[in-house]
Every structure is written in C-alpha cells, then in structure tokens.
Amino acid sequence: MAQPRLLLIDDEPALAEYLANAAKTSGFDPVITARDEDFRNEFLANPPEMVALDLGMPVDGVELTRFLADQDYRGPVLIVSGFDRRVLESAFRLGEALGLNMAGPVEKPVRLEALEELLGNLKANLVQ
C-alpha cells in the first residue's frame, strides 16, 4: 500500500524539513511547499490524505483553511505555528466551524517525539 501523502506549507525551510522528516518516520510521504500558490497548485493537482499548515506566513494560514473548506477537503488538517496558544485554538475552531477535520493544533517549537506520535496516530486513523 502506498504511503499517504502529507502536504505541508511552511516558509521556514529548516522547520519544513523537520516536519517532513517526522512525517516520513510516521509513515507519510511528505510534500513541502513554502508559498500559498505552490500549496494550492499541488493540492489541486494531487489532493493529499493530510495537510499541515503554518499560520504565520506571508499568506495567512487561516486563508488556506478557508481554501481547504471551499475544496470540501475531508482529510486531517494539522495547524503548526509559533503563535500564542489562543490564536492556535481560534484557528482550530474556525476550521471546525468550516467543516474541516482539524487535528492539533501544535505549538512551535515542536517536540519531535510528540509530533511523531501525533502523526502516527493520525496515519493509523487514515488506514482504518
């Protein structure tokens, strides 16, 4: 069985690689994007089984959350950000209100073990 694809967007290359490595360890095939246009194009060309969004980029992660809702996306959406916990929780609630399958949110800096555990659990739920 092919590994599920995880499409992630983060404008910090080192953190994007860190997240991608955790995703690989957890059994995902990660695809990294750094710009919203690339994220949207990749999403439309090959919809992933899961998405990970950074809120703090030149394009607001909340805008991408709305994009996912407009696409009627049903896979898990993980928010990973260095913003205050209240901001993360607000973005999470917005995603839920838009009908998305929200996972997380995860605060930066991210602990590798916790991230791998979360991703492993999400992957297990995908294959059930």
Q: What does each model-identified segment do?
A:
Residues A2-A14, L19-A23, V51:
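Conserved acidic segment of CheY-like receiver
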Residues N21-S26, E42, L94:
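Alpha-helical interaction/dimerization surfaces of two-component signaling modules
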Residues I32-M50:
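Acidic, metal-coordinating helix/loop segments flanking the phosphotransfer/catalytic sites
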Residues L44-N46, L68-R74, A97:
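Conserved phosphotransfer cores of two-component systems
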Residues A52-R74, D84, L88-S90:
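Conserved phosphotransfer microenvironments
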Residues G61, F92-A103:
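As written
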Residues I79-G82:
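Hydrophobic/aromatic residues positioned on beta-strands within the core alpha/beta folds
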Residues R86-V87, E107-K123:
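C-terminal output helix
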